[in-house]
Curated annotation (Swiss-Prot):
Swiss-Prot/TrEMBL cofactor(s): Mg(2+)
Pfam family, one: MMR_HSR1
InterPro entries: G_ENGB_dom, GTP-bd, GTP-bd_ribosome_bio_YsxC, P-loop_NTPase
Entry's family note: Belongs to the TRAFAC class TrmE-Era-EngA-EngB-Septin-like GTPase superfamily. EngB GTPase family.
Coiled-coil segments on the chain, per record: none
Presence of the UniProt keyword Manganese in the record: no
Domain of life of the source: Bacteria
CDD domains (UniProt xref): YihA_EngB (cd01876)
MF terms in GO: GTP binding; metal ion binding
Organism, as annotated: Mannheimia succiniciproducens (strain KCTC 0769BP / MBEL55E)
Keywords, sorted A to Z: Cell cycle, Cell division, GTP-binding, Magnesium, Metal-binding, Nucleotide-binding, Septation
Function according to Swiss-Prot or TrEMBL: Necessary for normal cell division and for the maintenance of normal septation.
Domain EngB-type G: 27-201
Listed name of the protein: Probable GTP-binding protein EngB
Length: 205
């Protein structure tokens, strides 16, 4: 069997939804990108797709309040979920987002994996752990990307990856941890390979 590989550079914007009920039909395959506001989700999507402005990066954390869908190829979609956990967002809105994220992870049939992005210097905050827990309890595989890895030396980076790998063992799910830096092109290939492995299951179903 030939190796399954999608060309992420062909990814294009599909649509935005204010909540899970406005999403397109639950079909094909989706992989979600989740993370705290300013964890670097948009930057990671832009690096993966080699498009500077595919996902709008914002200097204001909490700006991305919509669910944004991108199509790699027909039936293969990437989903940019609203950033969570930013203090300047009203409490009511934060709770609403968390409810929506939980609903999406637990009820979206075409969701096949979750990429959770965390700043390598501040990983595994409460809401990050909540996201991992939701994903694992929904039998979804998880890739934890420790972003902004260029901010640490190589030895500090390796140490932090090891620490996070040990810290997530109690979750007991299919959780992989990798360092990532859009700026220094660290981890982009690993991200693409993981997405391919998740997407390829559509062919075997």
């Amino acid at each position: 069997m030939t190796e399954f590989k999608l060309n992420y550079h062909k990814t294009h914007f599909m649509t935005s939804a204010a909540n899970i009920h406005q999403l397109p039909k639950d079909e094909g395959m989706e992989i979600a990108f989740a993370g705290r506001s300013n964890a670097g989700k948009s930057t990671a999507l832009n690096a993966l797709t080699n498009q500077k402005n595919l996902a709008r990066t914002s200097k204001t954390p909490g700006r991305t309040q919509l669910i944004n869908l991108f199509e790699v190829e027909p039936q293969y979609k990437l989903v940019d979920l609203p950033g969570y956990g930013y203090a300047a967002v009203p409490e009511q809105m934060k709770l609403q987002w968390q409810k929506s994220l939980g609903e999406y992870l637990q009820h979206r049939e075409c969701l096949k994996g979750v990429v959770i992005l965390m700043d390598i210097r501040h990983p595994l905050k409460d809401l990050d752990q909540q996201m991992i827990e939701w994903a694992v309890s929904s039998d979804l595989p998880v890739l934890l990307l420790l972003t902004k890895a260029d901010k640490l030396s190589q030895s500090a980076r390796s140490k932090q990856v090891k620490t996070v790998r040990e810290a997530i063992l109690p979750f007991q799910g299919d959780v992989q941890v990798e360092a990532f830096s859009a700026q220094n092109k660290i981890g982009i290939d690993k991200l693409a390979a993981k997405l391919d492995s998740w997407f390829s299951s559509l062919l075997t179903e």
